[in-house]
Amino acid sequence: GTTEQKERWLPALAGDDFPHLTAAWGESHWDFDPLNPRTLATVQGDNYVLNGHKAIVPLAEDADLILVYASEEGAPQVFLVEKGAPGLTVSPRERNMGLNALATYEVVLENCTVPLSAKLGGEQGADVKKLLAYSRVGLGGLSVGLARTAHAYAMNYAKERQAFGRPIAQFQSIAFMLAEMAWEVDAARLMVLEAAWNLDKGNDGLSQSALAKVYTDEMVLMVADRAVQILG
């Protein structure tokens, strides 16, 4: 962000009056390309005018600030859209197959007007590819944390649960599942660490972050499924 954007938002984000913040990235069409969103941003005088629909936006109804990803002259950019901005509408809560604990919404932008200063990074803009890489590493770390917790819970349960006079952890089928969960979690953890290390070193890191995100997505589903089986 620019110096002005940092002075405006960082003290609030680091203070007690933490504003609700969310990101409007996805769009509800089958060929959605995160680096070529259909939501458009055009310059009109001293403002940007945003038009488009964003889907699966978490906690949008309560957000004080929404980071809207939009295309400006064919390049992806990020815009800081504050709650109550003219032309910004948050639709009723979406009905999802999963993630019922996390409310998601559609965000509609109809000639939504924001000042030129609302463009993240100022006139030069932001490196959206790098932002995407950082977000993938963060989500990968989240998946690893969830999987480690599920594995630990299943392991403790298997050591305590008795069947036929011994803990079920001693049965080969259960032991194999616990072992597979352990190596998958550790492999995913190392992939996330490698991706994070590359980003910290200023390297490209795009391929590593993408690989880590894909692998951890598959891994956490497998580990959670095995944990449910072990718990009966």
Each model region followed by its residue ranges:
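A short, Trp-centered hydrophobic/proline-enriched beta-strand micro-motif
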Residues: D16-E27
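Flexible, small-/acidic-enriched active-site or ligand-binding loops
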Residues: N36, V57, G84-L116
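Alpha-helical interface subdomain recognition
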Residues: T3-Q5, D16, V43-Y48, V108, ...
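A short core secondary-structure module
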Residues: H53-V90
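N-terminal glycine-rich flavin-associated loop
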Residues: G1-Q5, D31-D33
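Active-site-adjacent elements of ketosynthase-type condensing enzymes
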Residues: H29-L40
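Short beta-strand-to-turn element immediately C-terminal to the catalytic PLP-Schiff-base lysine
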Residues: G1, T42, V68-S71, L80-E82, ...
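Acidic-glycine-rich active-site phosphate/pyrophosphate-binding loop
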Residues: S117-A126
